[in-house]
Structure formats: C-alpha cells, structure tokens
Amino acid sequence: MAQRDIETVIDNVVGNKVIPASTRQDIIERTDGIPLFVEEMTKAVLEAGSEGAAQQRTIASFPSTALAVPASLQASLMARLDRLGAAKELAQVGAAIGREFSHALLSAVVSEPERTLASMLDRLIAAGLLFQQGVPPHSSYLFKHALVQDAAYGTLLREPRRALHARVAETLDVQFPEIAENQPELLAHHCTEAGLIEKAARLWGRAGQRSLERSALVEAVAQFTRALHQITSLPASPELRRDEIKFQIALIAPLIHVKGYGAPECKAAMDRARLLIQKAEALGEPPEDPMLLFQVLYGFCVASYVAFDGDMLGEFAVQFLGLAEKQRAPVPLMIGDRVMGAYLTGTGNLKQGQAHYDRAIALYEPS
C-alpha cells in the first residue's frame, strides 16, 4: 500500500484516539505496506498504551517506551495474545485444532463451563483475532489470518503442544467419529503431532486411499508418502511390513499420473515396492494379496514400454509371465501374454508376438 493508504488503515484502527507522529511513522516504516501488518501493529500499540490508563488520558500522553512499535508482526501478535489472559489458552487450543474450528469440538476439547468459554471467545472476537459464524453451540470460528493462528500455536511449548494434539485426536476419535471417518487426514495430523506415530501412519494411508478414490492424486501422493515416512521411523514388525508394502504399492499409481511413467520418482517407488516384497518373502511373510507383485511388475513393463526400452521391457515381461504361469492365475496370465506380445512385436518377432496375443485373447473374459 501507498503511505496514504497505510495512514487510512491506521486512522480506522485508532478511531478517536491519538498516537504520536513518531509512533505513526514507525508503524509506516516497519510494516512494508502490508495491510494485516499495519492493522495488527497499530492494535498492539494501542493495547500496550491503554493498559492501566485512566479513561481521559490520550495515547499521545504516553512515553515513547509505552508506545514502542513491535519489531515484527509475530512479536506484535504475541504481545496481543499475552494481554488476553485466560483467553490466550483458548486461542492456543483453537490454533492446535486448525485455522477454522467448530464450537462443539472446541467445547469438547477444553471442557470449560459454557459461560466461561463464551466469555473467552468474546475476548478473542473483540480483539479481532477470531471471526464467528453462527450462534453457539452451532457456531464455528475462523482465525482472522493464518499468521494469527501461527502466533497462537507458536506460544505452546513442545510437551503441552503434544498433549493438546493427543487430546484433540482422542476427542475426534471418540466424540466425532464421523469426522474421523470422513477426514482421516485431520485425525492423522493430530496423531502425528501428538507422537502417536503408528496410528498416524495407518490414518495417513487411509487418507491416501480416500484421496485416490476421489482422483485427488496430488493429495494421495502426499498422504501415502507421509504414511511411509511414519512407518520407517518405527521398529519393524510383520504388521508394519505388510502396511508398508500396501502403501508403497498404492503410491505408484497416483505418482505415475502426477509425474509420468518415466519420472525417476516412479522408478524409485517401484524399485522400493519390489524390494519390500522380496524382503517379506525372505522372512516368510509373503503379502496376503498375491496380486501385489504383479502390480509392481506391470508398472515396470509399462514404464519400459513408454521409454522405448526394449531390453528392460523384455526382462520384466519374462518375470511377469513366469510368475503368472507359476501361480496359474488367469488374469495375470492374460496380462502376461499381452505384455510379452508387445515386447516381441516391438522387437520385430511378429510371429511369436502374435502367438502371445492370441493366448491373451483366448484368456480374456469380458465379464
């Protein structure tokens, strides 16, 4: 904003009060013309100046130390939060829940009497930190800006923060099962921040599957990746190894759609999936779904075909068809013959390739 616009914002916040010209100039210089910064800085200056003041005293009469402009927006917001008393703790709870939260969830997490809760919410709203929509207990609240939420959240120490996220996670799980079911990523986030890693991993995997079903492919990649990251931080167990294989293979399809078959990330994901299956088999823990390895090998086949890498396509086609013949599974046999046919015809072996295509057609069942 231009200086004239900045001064207009300051005037709107100050109202009929007066601040020294030097303080006004400090605000103008430190806020870089950012509207939120201007507004929050001015409010912080007014609140600092009005503490302990008699009603008739003007802001202009305060010494410069009382009207010191905070050095940053973060400092300004934190100073305003510190002056809210008990309402600051409510802001911290809200910040841990998210940028927007319902009255019902907030009330369940804080377990305060409704009158006390209403009083603290009124203070936050009056301070311009929260917006309210609707009437309690059916209302919802929104932090004025993400920076306000960040400032409130940033005042939490590590252990209280973890405990708060654990409380939110438990509340969602027990009292709001519909949210936990329909928004597993929300519950996963709180479990992650609470240090409930194993539970978080499975929830991120569930969230990834839901995103995949909705064709939200970028979100699915991020969520499956988070699930896998959580698992690798835990001590190994047969159950976690099964989950890791499942999530690693589930990651491949959305990753291919987002990055393309030839992307190194896709090859790395398929390599990792195949390695995990091989390790599980070596431990006597083969995947419960025998089709999982076929999914990985088929991904390699298509990636090789798209990259015009005949040698690699041939190698994976042989592996795929060999495994299908070993298991005598009709669908993998059909796909294996089709892949082998593509390899052979692509390398000039038309007669042999046609034989595999004929076998694939014979195995095909439209139903």
For every predicted segment, state its role.
Residues 113-114, 131-132, 151-363:
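Inter-helical turn/loop elements of alpha-helical hairpins
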